[in-house]
Amino acid sequence: MTQRRAYRWPQPLAGQQARIWYGGDYNPDQWPEEVWDDDVRLMKKAGVNLVSVGIFSWAKIETSEGVYDFDWLDRIINKLGEAGIAVDLASATASPPMWLTQAHPEVLWKDYRGDVCQPGARQHWRPTSPVFREYALKLCRAMAEHYKGNPYVVAWHVSNEYGCHNRFDYSED
């Protein structure tokens, strides 16, 4: 793999001309790996040249505290990149894993009645939680270190849909 320069905006993959980015979210971790080739083929047929990957993947990337599995993500990023589809890599912090919410229930947000939002959906974390931020930062650092030189990762985005489900947190802090 060749080293890429840092740019403010995503740059085309090596050998491609600049053009408008066209694509969307892709969640390969929610499907059997056997369908990935067909997914990529259909994306190419539709003219897709950029996809966001990893948005809700924290539990699959960090399978337990401090234990990271990037193998599946490496495979799909390479598969996409080799097909000429660039990757906007998400921080995977949109949905914390069950091991985190069980060990640290204080990361869960409360509604106006004081009821705690239970895990099982997305954005069940509270933005004011220092514990959540600490674990999210560890994940982001591990991902950045692992993917810093990957030529197929042309952009990064942190979390997803800020304020969508957890905008009204009535926790004490």
Where on the chain are the PLM-derived regions?
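Hydrophobic faces of well-ordered beta-strands that scaffold small-molecule active sites
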Residues: 20-24, 51-53, 87-91, 154-158
